[in-house]
Amino acid sequence: SGLFCAVKVITNIADAFQTVEVNLNKWKPVIPNKKFDVNIRWPEDIQAEQRIFDEKLPAVQEFLKHNKFNEVTHDATNKELGIIAVGKSYVDTLTTLQKHNIVPEKHGISILKIGMSWPLQGSLIEKFCSDHEDILIIEEKGSLVEDQIYKLLYGYSYAPRIYGKNLLSRCL
């Protein structure tokens, strides 16, 4: 898409080391067939914002739709709780459930793994949330994903109850 990008590295990853062999033959990303200028200009011209919103962000959404950065990994049939877990929090969530012998699907828990946290894949979030009455968002310190979900679902008749950074204050 030609957008600026960043990678968030948490302490557990930054303070660890491991040699990893990457096999690029295993992951073949689907690249949308969009024709526009992906080059970054410096200094950027006045039409930059228009290109971002009209061309580049839609290209990112198209890329997300065809590649599994964000996906439902556990899909309960009796959907009581939807958990949206972001990045390393996804692994921590699965570890915690396993430690307490909780099989998500047997307990009515569906889990959506978020690997790319901005911009969120709106259609996937809306579909996942429409199937649940309660959503628990688990992410690191900031509320980047939680805030996006509030904005995505604002005004929808099916909007579930959302618990995230505000969970503790609701319990007290």
Short names for language-model regions:
Residues 1-172:
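Flexible, low-complexity linker and terminal segments
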